[in-house]
Amino acid sequence: MKYIAKKFGSLILTLLLVSFLSFFAFSVIPGDAAKSQLGTEATPERIEALQKEMGLDRPVLERYASWVAGFFHGDLGTSYSYSMPVTDLIRDKVPITITITIIAFLMILAVSIPIGIFTAQHAGGHLDRLIMTLNQVIMSVPGFFIGILITYFFGLILKCFQPGAYVSISENFTAFVGYLVAPSAAIALPRCAMAVKMLRSSVLSQMDADYVRTAYSRGNSARRVMYHHVLKNALIPVLTFWGMTIADIVANSIILEQVFSIPGMGSLLITSISNRDYPVVQGILVLIAALVIIINFAVDLLYGRIDPRIRVKDGKEL
């Protein structure tokens, strides 16, 4: 319980730090949100009136204190552009980005684990060299370019989906998920290649260990040794990579949502930055920071589940 309480306290402190830094940065960067909303022909009187309405005439620390008070009540402020609560605005976009993240991560697991194990078991063979060569190529290609290729070949030529024909989750759930498969694949492919390379290296390093030879000497089959002994230890460093991958998927979805014309959090973030809609930008940044911290916490817990030698007690690893 102490460990969980410590992690929860760390979550709150990190979110407050992220929110303060972003709040301070938005207050010092050039430009005025009120001028951006009214346009270049607005009179000084109208700009001043809108600044007062937005609360921009108050000191930065006072505005931040008001934001923190609202944050603990689930209020992230009001959007300048949409004139609606930021929480409601983000809530409509979260399911889209979360669905892309889940699909992409499941793709990474489904592809990287079997291929990583296979290449480790056949290290130095023809298929291993071919797969690792393809890995290098895929890792060097940006996700947005893969997204463009998928749109061209699978969308325009093979007609597997219609580019730009996004269907919301409320209209048709199956079509909604189906349309998100393409951007998820574009995000997942480079990360699949990296995960395969990492898992292969981790498995190979474990296969030369003394406990593996001991397991074979006791009459265990190669399959049992791999899945009950080697893989358990090989997954520990890969877990950290997978944890970081989820945060990376969320970050890359910002670009891929533009390529596939998907109205998710990424599209909202870019639009809000362009419009200087800082409450929305800050709300999304805090949400992403919370996601990263929660994922790291989950990874810490999984360490102890996979390897009993790693124990977490009272916030300390023993």
PLM features per residue range, with description:
Residues 2, 94-128, 172-318:
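Alpha-helical transmembrane segments of integral membrane proteins
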Residues 11, 93, 97, 133-136, ...:
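Residue-level signal for discrete positions within transmembrane alpha-helices
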Residues 133-197:
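Membrane-water interface segments at transmembrane-helix boundaries in multipass membrane proteins
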